[in-house]
Every structure is written in C-alpha cells, then in structure tokens.
Amino acid sequence: MHDVPWTLTREQFNLEAVLGLKTQTTLAVIVPAKNEASTIGAVLDAISTHAGLIDELVVVNDHSSDDTGVVADHHGARVVNLSGTSGKGAAMSAGLRATSSELLVFLDADVINTTTEYVPRLIQPLLEKEEVQLVKGYYERPLHNMPTGGGRVNELSARPILSLLYPGLGEIKQPLAGETAGRRSTFEAITMETSYGVEIALLIDIAHKFSVGALAQVDLGIRRHRNRPLEEL
C-alpha cells in the first residue's frame, strides 16, 4: 500500500496529457470569495485560458461588501451569493451543491499571481491515478522582501500536528493550502467542516476514510496573495 502522499513536481507536469485525459470527464472550478473584488478578475482570467478544460466556473460570494460578485460575473463566472457570512468550508459546500461535474477544483480568490497551469496541475494526479482522492497544491511563499519565509503556521503547527495523527500526513508540504482538487464522490462521502478548519479536516477525513496514499500534492511554483486585516477573515 502506498502510505505516503503522491507528489507531482514541476518537471512531471504534462499539459498535453492532462488536456487529453480531461475529455473523458467533467470539471468544475469553485472559487470561494469574500471581499476580493481587486483580485478575483485576474484569477478567473488566468484559469480560463485552456479551451474546453473547465465545464463549470463558479464563484461563491460569501456576503461580500464590495463588488466581488459583479467582477466575477463580468469575468465569466456563475456567481452563487450566500445570504450571510458562512465561513470558507460552508462556501465550498455551497459550490459543491451548485455544480454537477465529476472533478472539482477549489481555488483561493486572493492570490495575485495565479497562473494558467494551476487547474491542469491540480487535476493531473486525479486523471492519472484512480486511487488518488484529494490533491493539494504546494508552493514557495515569499515573505516581504525575502524569497521564502511565508507559511510559518504550516511549518510550526499544522504539519507537526498532522504527523502525530497520521505520520504520512507530515509529508504534505502545505496542508493549509486553499488550492485543492478532488472527486465529487469523495467530497460527498465526508462531512465538510464549515470554517477555515476545512483544509485540515479534509486531510484527516481522507486519510481516515481511504488512506494517506489517497492524497497527492502538486508543485504550483511561487504563490503571492493579498494579506487581509483580521476583521476581513
């Protein structure tokens, strides 16, 4: 049994193979967003480059007080408006209910350098390995003017705690990453945490229900996001 997560490096990414295999299934991309009018348009434009890749593009607008929904609609997404602030996990669940595709990709709306390869990279393990149920992105996170240093909560808290629960989970480089892909059947087989704890809960639930070997992680390069004040979270 494969008891550690699968890892897809940048060198192993094969866009042509992904586009070919994708024709055999359907894909929804879901972007939970709250007050991300300044970044959501660029995110949607970047991921919409490859014709025929995405069958459903949905932005779940979590009670934004800015023009997030308007901008998302202008950039081609179907907008699902939540009536009140619900939390990231609840927004992800709303996106799940609003779509019907077999494969799902969840992306953060505040990333300022989302690339055209995010979506195909995230689904490659799902297309190539039937045993993979959930995929997480990993990346370098510059901090201020330093090339690395971001993601300290991952290194100091999340990974050590996960290692205590399931040793193989400590191999996940970015357990708190919002860039996630999986199979509809997998998401429907578990109970989604409603808050920001959804990222950790997904890993634990998948490892428990399937195995650590049902997880994969893919290299997304360098990630930069808009830092928000605490009251916006």
Predicted regions mapped to residue ranges:
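Active-site donor/metal-binding and catalytic loop motifs
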Residues: 216-233
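A conserved acidic beta->alpha catalytic loop
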Residues: 61-69
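Acceptor/aglycone-binding surface of glycosyltransferases and processive sugar-polymer synthases
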Residues: 92-94, 116-186
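Catalytic donor-sugar/metal-binding loop of nucleotide-sugar-dependent glycosyltransferases
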Residues: 194, 204-221
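Conserved donor nucleotide-binding strand/loop of the catalytic core
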Residues: 55, 69-98
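N-proximal low-complexity "stem/linker" segments adjacent to membrane-targeting elements
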Residues: 1-45
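Short, acidic, metal-binding catalytic loop of nucleotide-sugar glycosyltransferases
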Residues: 45-54
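Short aromatic/hydrophobic "clamp" motif used to bind/position activated sugar donors
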Residues: 104
